[in-house]
UniProtKB/Swiss-Prot annotation:
It is found in: Nucleus, Nucleolus. It comes from Schizosaccharomyces pombe (strain 972 / ATCC 24843). Residues 34-80 have a biased composition (Basic and acidic residues). One of its GO terms (cellular component) is nucleus. It holds the Pfam family Cgr1. This is rRNA-processing protein cgr1. Residues 21-80 are annotated as: Disordered. The keyword rRNA processing applies.
């Protein structure tokens, strides 16, 4: 930088980026934050992330429970329909058997 002006490189090449200090001691006092304050911010951020994870997990559990409830309801409905069909078929067999018996009895009476 020439004459302390920012944004212009000594070489005059505008595509060169401005170099910054790697460690915190090179920063200005106004930019430095104490270690405790940084750790407090990091702790708060970690708490927020943990809470978000917990909320997501709870939401996923609720969604899974709802899906399972729907699945069991559909399964119960299918079982009910299947049993009704089976009962109707068995009832028809009983009716047919009674008719055959009545025919036999009628034929025996006519003799």
């Amino acid at each position: 930088m020439v004459n302390g002006t920012k944004g212009v490189c000594v070489s005059g090449k505008p595509w060169k980026t401005e170099k910054k200090a790697y460690n915190r001691s090179g920063l200005a006092d106004a930019q430095r934050t104490p270690y405790e304050k940084r750790m407090e911010q990091k702790r708060k951020l970690d708490e927020i992330k943990e809470r978000e994870k917990e909320l997501k997990r709870e939401k996923e559990e609720q969604r899974a429970a709802h899906a399972e409830k729907i699945r069991t309801r559909r399964q119960a409905k299918a079982d009910r329909e299947r049993m009704e069909l089976l009962q109707a078929k068995l009832h028809q067999k009983v009716i047919d058997r009674r008719r055959r018996r009545e025919k036999r009895n009628k034929m025996l009476k006519e003799r």
